[in-house]
Amino acid sequence: MEIILKYFPDLTEEQRKQFAALYDLYIDWNSKINVISRKDIENLYEHHVLHSLGITKTIQFRPGTSIMDLGTGGGFPGIPLAILFPEVTFHLVDSIGKKVRVATEVANAIGLKNVTFRHARAEEEKRTFDFVVSRAVMPLADLIKIIKKNISSKQQNALPNGLICLKGGELEHETMPFKHKTVIYNLSDSFEEEFFQTKKVVYVPI
């Protein structure tokens, strides 16, 4: 939890409580339904919560923004972002029902009111949103093909609507088809921990 306060010192008391509650909740649920690698659960705040919040290094979502988290798994990046942006709505989608259940139970336990959930494949979600966020779910080209239909034409943020992905490693080949409009942000510029040396946020306006 300290690592979250290190980079986000201005959290409200409610947000601090919500972030602090995540550890015990994920430890408990992960023992029943494996949504985080068992050897990685001890790194929950650095590898999962703070990593999710890396998206804020590209944009501060305005109140009223709608966001779909595609392939949310156990709730990342959607749940940490929903805590940080209580006036933004998040719709968390995953094709694996038991993972959606974990995300739903965690969100309910910490009293998140700005999240909804759906057990479905990405292709089945027809609604539109200002942004789609995702954490290394599939190659960029495949992801863009699927979520084009889900991006609203109504603009209300400093960045044009589009896709914001958390990715790692070498991305040159993956971003090549979109290189003229893709923005890549290195999380190592914001977070000093070694884990973030190869981690990036990729933004593609759509």
State what each model feature region is:
Residues 83-89, 151-154, 158:
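Conserved S-adenosyl-L-methionine
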Residues 156-170:
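Conserved beta-strand signature within the Rossmann-like core of class I S-adenosyl-L-methionine
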Residues 140-150:
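A short, conserved alpha-helix within the catalytic core of class I
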Residues 168-206:
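Active-site capping/gating segments
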Residues 30, 106-107, 151:
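Conserved hydrophobic residues forming the short capping helix/wall of the S-adenosyl-L-methionine
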Residues 28, 32, 45-63:
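Conserved alpha-helix/loop element of class I SAM-dependent methyltransferases that forms part
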Residues 53-134, 144:
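Conserved SAM/SAH cofactor-binding pocket of Class I
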Residues 1-38, 42:
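N-terminal auxiliary segments of SAM/dcSAM-dependent transferases
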